[in-house]
Amino acid sequence: RALAPRPAVAVRCQEGQLAVTVRRDLFGTGRPVRAAELSLGTASCPPLSPNSAQAFVTFVAALHECGSTLQVTPDSLIYRTTLFYKPTPSGNPLIVRATPAEVLIECHYPRKSNVSSGAVHPTWAPFRSTVAAQERLRFSLRLMDDDWSRERLSNSFQLGDSLRFQADVTSEGHVPLRLFVDQCVATVSPDRSSSPRYAFIDLGGCLVDGRADDTGSAFVSPRPRPESLRFLVDAFKFAGDAGNLLYISCHLRVTPVAQAPNPWNKACSFSKASGLWAPLEGTAAICSCCDTGSCPSPG
């Protein structure tokens, strides 16, 4: 018989204290939160000596500690406190990749026995992403399922998810073509020049979002074919924006397959392992301008 997975937050109400166990993969996205981003109560009590290698973080506190409150009812004593998740700000102040969360915790102590609060499964509200591509020839830009086998049926995502984009061009009747993405911009309105705006691909093919410490955004290697290009972008939203809709517009271009990639036509991802920009095809030199920001404008 398969064991049920442990809940994201579990509470044990003991005789004079409570113990809270928090799964580091708090939201079930596969991206663990940092122990330092978690605290208990209004007094911001830290967890017990956290170990980054462990899958769980534990808090232990006396019932009256960490700013807890007590309610006395005819049948019970009810101690209340709150688990806070306050994500570390992104390196880019324009965007956020995680939103704060609060989990209310209660311990009920009846006259003859005690009970623990039920398991809590916090979630983020999803936001929707609407994709539009500038069309030249017959271009398309699609959100794909996790295995890239078909177009994703839903445009709803949660922070912590990865967005899988596939760009294509239909090249019948043309010389063999290679597709590139010059720029992709996210906005909160259909106007790609509106503000706020965030260019996560820029400089003629640099996936600049992958440069941030908290992302795994990158072009996918190898291509399925020269006229297709896949890339991953970690889900995000604009800081301070109460809406749940993003518009993504990308500028696509093609070159003949016979033409080698160059600083004008490139697909460059930042490698966290090497600390360097790496091209999907071509020599490393074509990506050097991604660091300097002096890439030549595509023709």
Question: Which residue stretches match the model-derived regions?
Answer:
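Long, disordered, Ser/Thr/Pro-rich
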Residues: 1-299
